[in-house]
Amino acid sequence: MQYRSPENNRWSGYAFPGGHVENGEAFAESVIREIYEETGLTIQNPQLVGIKNWPLDTGGRYIVFCYKATEFTGSLQSSEEGEVSWVQKDQIPNLELAYDMLPLMEMMEAPDKSEFFYRHRTEDGWEKEIF
């Protein structure tokens, strides 16, 4: 997991490493590159396990592709993006997690679910649905 401090980031807490897709890059290539840049690990065979998305105030939509990988080489190293560490799965709920990490992880692990959708903002956050 990667910890992003509130002092240096728009959002903070423990979450998965991530990033953006560069021009001419496939989604799978971008996840391999981003994981290496942020953790020092080179992953193999990333598998798409879900999509997280929400509407933007401009009328567009922000889409996050969630991948998992079980094969990797290299040594875990933190980066300017945040501190990284291995965490036992049963200890994750005890961490200071980024917004909605637990329900996102549940969606990613559910064989019959593939989308975490923030429908619209509410007074106390978002109206959310998992498909």
What are these regions (language model features)?
Residues M1-A15, T42-I43, Q47:
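N-terminal strand-loop-strand
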Residues P6-E7, Q91-I92, E123-G125:
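Short acidic/polar capping segments at secondary-structure boundaries
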Residues N9, S79-E80, P111:
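A generic structural signal for short, non-catalytic loop/turn and secondary-structure boundary residues
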Residues M107-F131:
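Charged phosphate-binding loop/patch that engages nucleotide di/tri-phosphates or the phosphate backbone
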Residues A15-V21:
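Short glycine-enriched, charge-decorated loop/helix-capping segments at active-site entrances
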Residues V21-Q44, W54-L104, I130-F131:
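Unchanged
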